[in-house]
Structures are given as C-alpha cells and as structure tokens.
Design a protein with these regions (language model features):
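Short beta-strand segments of immunoglobulin-like
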Residues: 59-65, 160-165
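Flexible, low-complexity linkers/stalks enriched in Thr/Pro that connect modular domains
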Residues: 49-56, 147-155, 248-257, 262
Length: 265
C-alpha cells in the first residue's frame, strides 16, 4: 500500500499520479480508496474503485527451420514500468507435460529480443509451448505472452523381414521410406521370440546406399530359438526426436534334414 496526496486542479477536482515503482512494479488489479479530510480534521471514505494495469501487448513470433533442427524465437514491444533487465523464453512440449522445460535467455538487438533454440534440447514431436517472461528492475519475472509451434513426427513406409535363412538361423530387417524433415540419426530394431521378451536383443541398423536401413538378426542372440520373431523399429531423427515407427514379424523354422537309410545285403 502507498498513500498518495491528491492535488487540487483548476476545475476543483483532485488528482494523484500513481507510479508502479511504489508498488514493486507489480502488474495486477489495483484497489483505490479515496479518503477526504474535512476542515474539522475528520477523515472519511469518499469512494472506492479498481483499475487493471498490465504490460503492453508484445509481438511474439516463432520460426521453425525447414529441417526442424532449430526454431528462432523473437519478441518485440517488450516494455515494463521501470525498464526491462532480461527476457526469457520458457519452452516445453505438450507431450509429457513440462518434463522438458528449458528457460532460454534472449539477446536484444534493435529493440527485438531473440533466441535460436535446438529441438534436440527437448527431443519431442508435436506442439511446443513458448511463454515469454520479462525481468524488471526488481528481478521479478513477469509473464508477457505466449504462442506455440509444431514439430513433425517421424514415420516409415516399409518394415520388411527378408532373406530368412533357417540353416544359418538369420534374417534381415529392412526399414525404408523415412519421413523426417531433420533426417535420420539412428534406427534401432528390438527383436524377440518369447512372449515375456526375455530373449529381446536390440540391433542398430546400418544405412544402405539406397537410403534404407538394414540389420541382420541371428538366432544365436536369442538362445537359438526357432519360431515366430516379433520385430519393432525405433527411429531417432536428426533433431533428437525418438519414436516407435512400426512392427512386423518373421518366422524361422527348424531346418529340415534328409536322412538316407541303406540296407546292406
């Protein structure tokens, strides 16, 4: 609370100028009470009112790079009573709540606050929340506005089990048709044959000349089990986004043998 003494105006009214510095530079709803002291020194309430004081609207923009590796954040018209000391962008993805929240300090140039962020700091696809905070001369961070941007998911068009070899106990997993603006960093292929996944083995696929990724599965990594194998694929994109991208299966049967019986006379 701060008590102001109003000054009489030429029209007979009284006026007082309120300054936010007297109230910790707080932006909020302000309560105003008017007290009048009579000529007999009696003080009484003459009226009450409220007014809302908030920062001016900011111009907050996001520009996601075509390869979705980075996103450029900018904010202009960032103004506070008492001046702006620092500006921060609080960024997180909707997927998983705020478990990937990062506070980025912006840099000012020509009245525009900027920060280029890496999607790899969050490793998530979907909608990203961007909240803007300005720090006043008292060190308090004040919310100024918010916006969003979207990072693409990852998908593949084909997951194939090829070259099933019962004799050598192996088959190839080929993953192709990647849809990922930031490219492909790694492709992992977990494979198992038992219902409880006790024989699961993770293979790292290798990039082929045609852009596909391939991994060779060998039953020696699965206790030499024969039968149906479940195959899943996980892709890490160039921007760190990690996604399950599909599944298939393959069957390795016990190799058949030929037995010859000869009867000697």
């Amino acid at each position: 609370i701060y008590w102001y003494t109003a000054t009489k105006q030429s029209d007979g009214s009284y006026a007082a100028q309120v300054n936010l510095k007297n109230h910790g530079y707080n932006y909020s709803t302000y309560n105003i009470h008017v007290y009048v002291t009579s000529s007999t020194q009696v003080k009484m309430v003459a009226g009450v009112t409220t007014t809302e004081v908030y920062p001016p609207a900011v111009n907050l923009k996001t520009e996601l790079a075509a390869d979705e590796l980075t996103c450029n954040l900018t904010a202009s018209n960032v103004k506070l009573s008492g001046g702006v000391q620092k500006v921060y962008f609080a960024v997180w993805s909707d997927n998983g709540g705020q478990d990937d929240l990062v506070w980025y300090e912006a840099q000012e140039s020509g009245g525009v606050w900027k920060r280029n962020i890496s999607i790899a700091d969050h490793k998530t696809d979907g909608t990203y929340e961007v909240h803007l905070y300005a720090e006043n001369s008292s060190g308090k961070r004040i919310f100024m506005g918010n916006t969003t941007f979207d990072v693409s998911s990852i998908s593949v068009q084909k997951i194939q089990a090829k070259n099933v070899d019962a004799v050598n106990g192996s088959f190839d997993v080929v993953v192709s048709g990647f849809v990922s603006p930031s490219g492909v960093h790694t492709v992992q292929v977990p494979v198992w044959s038992k219902d409880d996944q006790s024989d699961i083995y993770w293979y790292t696929a290798t990039r082929q000349s045609d852009g596909s990724y391939a991994a060779q599965v060998n039953i020696k990594n699965h206790g030499y089990n024969y039968g149906k194998y479940t195959i899943h694929t996980y892709v890490t994109a160039g921007n760190g986004v990690y996604k399950f991208t599909g599944s298939t299966s393959a069957t390795i049967n016990v190799p058949t043998t030929t037995m010859q019986v000869g009867i000697q006379a």
